[in-house]
């Protein structure tokens, strides 16, 4: 009688929970769909089991549960870990991952300071690159001056440094800088400070929770300029309330409906689950899952160190995220997984908060047939 095969275990370290204490319902179905495909095709010789640890880390919670979750996943025999998601937790966790030197992790956090021998990044953005793209898009829209609101946090201040440089390079004058709390707060005084010099637009940088209330504050002071943000914009995909907070905003995202790799995955997802989640996270999960499955399938032997080496061998895998032509790869000294200038795109939430539309990439403006992008002048009120 043949002994039962032990599943290859993948850890999910989820460090940001929603107001109900949960997380995106499409994450696990997306990951499992890829795992099942690899097993069915014979690429993987054993089943895959996902072990989840979902905790409230920084900024709403604390770092310790994140650290504990990492060690628990290692003890559960995870061969690779997806997470954490938030830069403040990732930067703090790096030393523990590197000291243990047993299991590679792949983070979606945007700070390059957390990357290392055992820490790979497929970031939902990049603190070094997001400001360059954001400033370029603002300049393409005709802006020449901006007021800058930054969250007073590790993330916000790292963004602040790179945004100053990006605005200078794009020919944008920063008329004022104002720090805002990383959590919800009254923004009227801060917005009035930015409004004093009447810049062409305002920019927000940070994790994203600080953006809550900015629209209401701007409306209260009677000033609604063009508004730009980083991948904090991706909160718009989580539901109507967040789309209201981001109504009229232009921000960075990873969902591009023109990407056929992503659309083909969504076709399969819809056929399997009966609905079509047309936003960044499912296609991102398709990308991260293929990286992990490929590494598990090619690791010899099937251990954490061998999985790390297998990740380093992945080259030019077509990505479902980003604009068409985006690809995935790691390397011996390469820990940033995206290839291509358009791995991030700019989208815009419509004024009625009903949905977002494609707006631009770093290479130029994009005009959706049913929602042409406004000029900077027409966006002002």
Language-model features: locations:
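Extracytosolic ligand-binding ectodomains
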Residues: 1-381
């Amino acid at each position: 009688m043949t002994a039962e095969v032990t599943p290859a275990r993948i850890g999910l370290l989820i460090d940001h929970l929603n107001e109900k204490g949960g997380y995106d319902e499409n994450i696990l179905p997306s990951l499992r769909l890829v795992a099942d495909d690899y097993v069915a095709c014979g690429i993987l010789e054993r089943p895959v089991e996902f072990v989840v640890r979902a905790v409230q880390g920084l900024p709403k919670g604390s770092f310790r549960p994140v650290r504990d979750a990492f060690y628990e996943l290692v003890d559960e025999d995870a061969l690779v870990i997806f997470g954490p998601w938030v830069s403040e937790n990732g930067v703090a966790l790096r030393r523990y991952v590197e000291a243990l030197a047993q299991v590679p992790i792949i983070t979606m956090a945007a700070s390059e300071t957390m990357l290392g021998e055992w820490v790979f990044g497929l970031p939902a953005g990049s603190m070094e690159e997001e400001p360059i793209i954001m400033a370029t898009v603002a300049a393409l829209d005709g802006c020449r001056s901006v007021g800058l609101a930054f969250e007073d946090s590790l993330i916000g201040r790292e963004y602040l440094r790179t945004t100053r440089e990006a605005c200078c390079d794009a020919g944008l004058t920063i008329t004022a800088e104002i720090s805002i709390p990383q959590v919800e707060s009254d923004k009227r005084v801060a917005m009035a400070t930015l409004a004093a010099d009447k810049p062409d637009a305002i920019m927000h940088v940070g994790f994203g929770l600080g953006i809550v209330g900015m629209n209401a504050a701007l409306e209260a002071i009677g000033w609604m300029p063009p508004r730009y943000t980083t991948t904090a914009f991706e909160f718009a995909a989580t539901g109507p309330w967040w789309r209201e907070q981001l109504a009229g905003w232009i921000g960075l995202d990873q969902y591009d409906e023109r990407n056929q790799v992503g659309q083909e995955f969504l076709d399969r997802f819809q056929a399997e689950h009966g609905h079509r989640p047309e936003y960044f996270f499912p296609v991102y999960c398709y990308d991260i899952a293929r990286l992990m499955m490929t590494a598990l399938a090619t690791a010899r032997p099937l251990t954490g160190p061998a999985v790390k080496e297998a990740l380093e061998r992945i080259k030019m895998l077509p990505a479902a995220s980003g604009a068409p032509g985006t690809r995935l790869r790691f390397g011996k000294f390469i820990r940033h997984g995206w290839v291509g200038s358009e791995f991030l795109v700019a989208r815009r939430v419509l004024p009625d908060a009903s949905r977002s539309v494609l707006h631009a990439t770093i290479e130029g403006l994009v005009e959706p047939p049913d929602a042409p992008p406004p000029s900077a002048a027409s966006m002002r009120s």
